[in-house]
Regions:
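Short amphipathic alpha-helical segments
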Residues: 4-12
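Active-site SXXK
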Residues: 11, 25, 31, 54-82, ...
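A short, well-structured edge-of-sheet supersecondary motif
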Residues: 11-49, 105, 117-121, 269-272, ...
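Short, P/G- and charge-enriched loop/turn segments at secondary-structure junctions
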Residues: 12-15, 55, 138, 256, ...
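Active-site-proximal loop and beta-strand segments within enzyme catalytic domains
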Residues: 42-146, 315
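Short, surface-exposed loop or secondary-structure junction motifs
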Residues: 96-282
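Short, gly/Ser/Thr-rich active-site loops of penicillin-recognizing serine hydrolases
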Residues: 255, 314-339
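Short, well-ordered beta-strand elements
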Residues: 301-314
Length: 339
């Protein structure tokens, strides 16, 4: 197995320079796993060292760990088509041009401003989201938005009668035996904290994302908590294609551009990682606002799990983004060089 010494060095430097409190990480090479952790899980109001088996607020990793798989399973079962319109399942949405494919590839062009969005009760937020509109980017640009995956969750609920977070639990977490992963942690102390908020105080064991906080189990864009080792199980299931949450017909397609124009670097939820060298690769990845990221190479059966709480104690911590991208670049280079 590759030693990944440069990637680990860069992770430790990230912590030592105070960019993040700590990092839990894992490298996957087929059935081999190398994992570790470094740093703290909490700085304020008091210091706590990072421990094994802690739950991380995955933020937008919820989209690809959960919602994407539920949607593709419904398509595979014949309950849904990628060409189906949003309007067909949510009649309150007036526009008839936006399809499931647009939503799952972030090419819907849905836009608009909702005043006081983070202070609305769930029903008001639901109605306000359905009153947004399609802008000029429709189908022409990939513009990442939580709204696309909130709507996908509502589509899945309209079909099954079950809220999206329960569907993710039943269709992904339980079959993969991701036994620690949950949308409702029972004990805050087993969770890595996120922001120290002016309005909410220390956010720990409760979802950080404001829309997910309001919508609760009806949010398909964020809300999942998971341990590093559960995410290793998730990645290995996809890489080995054993009990994969991605249905067989979509296994090959998941590393291909699925946008309507076929040129926007997005698969079903996943972002595609461009690679400029000659090594065979099928790299997909996704990140979460709280400081999380996962990478998969379907050609080489390798994966990377990176979990931090970059919004602790303060958000947004913009310098983190370039450093995270550099760590992923180091990882990709290191695994290819070794290969």
């Amino acid at each position: 197995m590759v030693a990944y010494s440069k990637t680990i060095r860069d992770i430790k430097t990230l912590v030592e320079e105070g960019v993040v409190p700590g990092v839990s990480y894992a490298f996957i090479d087929g059935d081999q796993v190398q994992s570790g952790l470094y740093g703290a899980e909490q700085l304020l109001p008091g210091y706590e060292p990072l421990k094994e088996n802690q739950l991380y607020d995955l933020a937008s990793l919820t989209k690809v760990v959960g919602t994407v798989n539920v949607i593709l399973q419904l398509v595979d079962e014949g309950q849904l088509k990628l060409a189906d319109t949003l309007h067909a399942y949510l009649p309150e949405w007036a526009d008839s041009s936006v399809t499931v494919r647009h939503l799952i590839t972030h090419t819907s062009g849905i836009t608009g401003y909702i005043p006081n969005r983070n202070k609305m009760p769930a029903r008001e937020l639901h109605d306000a989201l359905l009153n947004l509109h399609v802008g000029p980017d429709f189908e022409q640009k990939m513009v990442y938005s939580d709204i696309n995956f909130i709507f996908l969750g509502w589509v899945a609920e309209a079909i099954t009668g079950t809220p999206i977070q329960q569907l993710i639990t039943d269709r992904v977490l339980k079959p993969l035996k991701m036994t620690h992963s949950t949308f409702a942690p029972s004990d805050p102390t087993i969770c890595v904290p996120t922001e120290v908020s002016a309005t909410r105080g220390l956010i720990r064991g409760v979802v950080h994302d404001p829309k997910a906080f309001i919508l609760r189990d009806r949010c398909g864009s964020a809300g999942l908590f998971a341990t590093r080792d559960d995410l290793v199980k998730f990645e290995q299931a996809i890489l080995s294609d054993t009990h994969s949450p991605i249905p067989d017909p979509f296994r090959a397609q998941i590393a291909e551009d699925q946008t309507p124009l076929g040129t926007q670097g997005r698969s079903f939820g996943w972002a595609l990682l461009p690679v400029s060298d000659a090594h065979p690769h099928q790299c997909i990845w996704h990140s979460g606002y709280t400081g999380t990221a996962i990478v998969l190479d379907l050609a080489t059966n390798q994966g990377f799990v990176f979990l931090s709480n970059r919004v602790h104690p303060d958000a947004p911590n913009e310098p983190f983004l370039a450093r995270r991208n550099a760590i992923i670049a180091t990882y990709l280079d290191e695994k290819r060089t070794a290969g």
